[in-house]
Amino acid sequence: LKGVLPKDFGRAGLDKQRLGQIINLVSDIAFNSPLPAGEGPGVRADRAKDTLGRVYEYFLARFASAEGKSGGQFYTPSRVVRVLVEMLAPYKGRVYDPCYGSGGMFVSSEKFIEAHSGRIGDISIYGQESNYTTWRLAKMNLAIRGIDAQIAHGDTFHRDAHPDLKADYVLANPPFNDSDWRGELLKDDKRWVYGAPPAGNANFAWVQHFIHHLAPTGLAGFVLANGSMSSNQSGEGEIRKAIIEADLVDCMVALPGQLFYSTQIPVCLWFLRRDKRHLPSPGGRGVGGEVRDRRGETLFIDARKLGTLVDRTHRELSDADLARIAGAYHAWRGDKGAGAYTDVPGFC
């Protein structure tokens, strides 16, 4: 964590006794709890990391809620992240988030692997974040959980830290409708295969950046404002049309409003797939497992009626909601053990 923690922690006037008490309190979390019969010290350490991670995640969520709109710069609600992760199912390979905020996508990916009895070492994590404060939050978030990642601080569009990366999975929640991305300096960029995005809105710059970094059998899942599905301003409609005609759009999910701390407007999830006949192949070697051939097809899921209000301004998706959305996608895709897909009027 060198260069990450604020310099205030090293200043001479700091109450060293109080700081020591805090350090001891954190150090005691789960490390000194009795071990169940048959479990070794490694289990205790894992529990300690998980507990610390949960505490950190809790405070991130509380901070994002208190900050309101500005909180959206670093925090994606955990339930939205879980929808993305459950649908992409990143068991093995390279996971990439070019605007990773506080690192929630990475944390959720590792949780998914653990929940499905996978091996953490089977995935490699790459990312980039332009906001220095947010980058520091992510570094601490990952360090607390013992997650190893190749994450960089810098502008993804203008100084791509992973220019040659071809990822098996891309997960992201880019800034909505960002007009301050200096797009006028990148008009002829090689990433704009489907058309130069407008300088006043980075939505389709992000989409094409994701596509650029996808492996031949790669999958991408990301959050965008609902306007991305219908906007025709400044050539956005033509870019969207070109992406659709390239048969990259695998699934679209319309989510209910009030899920985010930063905005009350409804958002949607985009899922792109380069190869609609195979699952991702770790490391880009050949092809992965076969699934139903969905070339020329796209699944639409209308989840706008799901979720429940947890307070006056915020809604949250339940575990049942998550299972319903992800289950429909995996059944449609033809994943092993997902069951038969059936159209449900008003939902999919």
Regions found by a protein language model. Name each.
Residues 1-91, 150-161, 254-257, 293-308, ...:
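Non-catalytic, mostly N-terminal accessory regions of nucleic-acid modification and defense proteins
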Residues 16-19, 49-52, 106, 236, ...:
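Alpha-helix initiation and N-capping motif
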Residues 25, 29, 58, 62, ...:
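Conserved, well-folded catalytic cores of nucleic-acid-processing
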Residues 34-36, 279-282:
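Low-complexity, intrinsically disordered short segments enriched for Gly/Pro and polybasic residues
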Residues 38-40, 283-286:
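Glycine-biased, low-complexity coil/linker segments
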Residues 70-172, 177-181, 186-193, 204-205, ...:
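Conserved S-adenosyl-L-methionine
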Residues 164-279, 292-348:
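A conserved structural/catalytic subdomain of Rossmann-like adenosyl-cofactor enzymes
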